[in-house]
A protein has these predicted regions:
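Substrate-binding/active-site clefts of carbohydrate-active enzymes
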Residues: 6-8, 12-72, 79-198, 228-234, ...
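Catalytic metal-binding/acid-base residues of hydrolase active sites
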Residues: 125-126, 209-212, 246
Length: 311
C-alpha cells in the first residue's frame, strides 16, 4: 500500500502559507486579524481566534517545498468552516471554508499534489461538531427537529453533552441512524463525498477517535471506525484511514477499522520519563507515568514494548 513507509507532513492551514487571494477575504466577527509575522498568542484568550489567513492556495504554492524535504503525504487539519482558527468546531461538513478558498481551492490543491506525486488526507471530527453547525442549530431548543437525535440533548434540547464539557463542541449521538447515513455510511455521506471526484482525497484522519461514540452506557467506538472504513473501502478502495488515540489502540488496527493510528503515548510517555528531572517541578511528572528518570536504552526498550502491542 502507498502509505507503508510514507512520510506524513501535517499542515495547519491558517499558519502554513498565505496566498495573495487571502487579502480580499472578509474576516468573520470572531476572528482577531494578525499580520503574518505577528507574535502568536500562545495560550489563554484569543488563542483560537487569532487569524493569520493561511489558505489552501498558499499550500499549493509550496508543494515543491514538501517534496524537497521528503514528504509523501500532505495531511490537512480541518478545512471545513468553523468558529476558530483550528476549525475542529465545524459549522458544516458539506463545504470547504471560503476563508481557505472554498471547494475549488481544495480540488486544485489535490490535483496539483497528485501531479507531484503527493497524497492528500483530510481531518474529520466524528466525535463532535461545532455549536454553530447546521445540524446542531436545527435541533437546539427544538426537540421535534429531525436532527434532535444527532446529539445528546437534555431539558428540552437546551442542555447537551460535549467534548470534555466544552460548550462549543457538542458530542454526536451515534444511536442515530440518520446521522450515520448523512455522515459516515454510504456513497452519499460526508466521509464519501470528499474522497470521490471532483475532490479525490486519499484518506481521512479521525480526530479523537478514542472518544468517538463513547459516553456513559453507549459504546459505539469500535463500530464507528468499522463503518467509516467500510464506506471508504466502498467508494475509494485505495484510501487510507488513521485514527487519533491517546492510549492503547491495538484492537482498532486488526484489519476492519483503522489502518494506522496516532498513538502519542507510545512515544511521549517513555520520552517524558527520559527527560524527567526529579529536582524540577516539570509538568511531565504529573501524568501518571512515574517520576523516576530512565536512561536512553530504557527509553528505547519502553518504546519498543508499546509498539510491539500492535499487530
Amino acid at each position: 500500500r502507498w502509505a507503508s513507509g510514507a512520510v506524513l507532513y501535517q499542515v495547519f492551514p491558517d499558519r502554513f502559507a498565505r496566498s495573495q487571494e487571502a487579502d480580499n477575504r472578509k474576516l468573520p466577527e470572531w476572528a482577531i486579524a494578525k499580520s503574518w509575522d505577528a507574535e502568536v498568542i500562545g495560550k489563554g484568550p484569543g488563542t483560537a481566534e487569532q487569524f493569520f489567513g493561511g489558505d489552501l492556495k498558499g499550500i499549493e504554492e509550496h508543494l515543491d517545498h514538501l517534496k524537497k524535504i521528503g514528504a509523501t503525504i500532505l495531511y490537512l487539519t480541518p478545512f471545513f468552516p468553523g468558529g476558530s482558527n483550528h476549525r475542529y468546531d465545524a459549522s458544516s461538513f458539506n463545504e470547504v471554508d471560503p476563508l481557505l478558498g472554498g471547494n475549488a481551492a481544495l480540488k486544485s490543491l489535490v490535483e496539483r499534489a497528485h501531479a507531484k506525486g503527493l497524497r492528500v488526507m483530510g481531518d474529520l471530527t466524528a466525535n463532535h461538531s461545532g455549536d454553530k453547525h447546521e445540524w446542531f442549530l436545527a435541533a437546539y431548543k427544538n426537540p421535534k427537529a429531525p436532527e434532535s437525535d444527532f446529539y445528546y440533548f437534555q431539558d428540552g434540547n437546551k442542555k447537551y453533552d460535549s467534548w470534555w464539557g466544552v460548550p462549543s463542541l457538542p458530542k454526536f449521538n451515534w444511536n442515530s441512524q440518520e446521522l450515520r447515513k448523512r455522515f459516515i455510511l454510504g456513497k452519499s455521506s460526508v466521509v464519501a463525498k470528499w474522497l470521490k471526484s471532483p475532490y479525490g482525497l486519499d484518506g481521512w484522519r479521525i480526530d479523537v477517535a478514542n472518544m468517538t461514540g463513547w459516553i456513559r452506557e453507549d459504546n459505539f467506538n469500535r463500530e464507528i471506525g468499522q463503518v467509516i472504513r467500510g464506506t471508504m473501502d466502498d467508494v475509494a478502495p485505495d484510501s487510507f484511514l488513521i485514527g487519533e488515540f491517546t492510549s492503547d489502540a491495538a484492537n482498532h488496527v486488526e484489519g476492519d477499522s483503522y489502518q494506522s493510528t496516532m498513538t502519542y503515548s507510545n512515544f511521549t510517555r517513555p520520552v517524558w520519563r527520559w527527560l524527567w528531572n526529579p529536582k524540577e517541578k516539570r509538568e511531565e511528572g504529573q501524568v501518571g507515568v512515574g517520576r523516576k528518570g530512565i536512561a536512553a536504552s530504557e527509553l528505547m526498550q519502553l518504546h519498543k514494548q508499546f509498539a510491539g502491542i500492535f499487530p
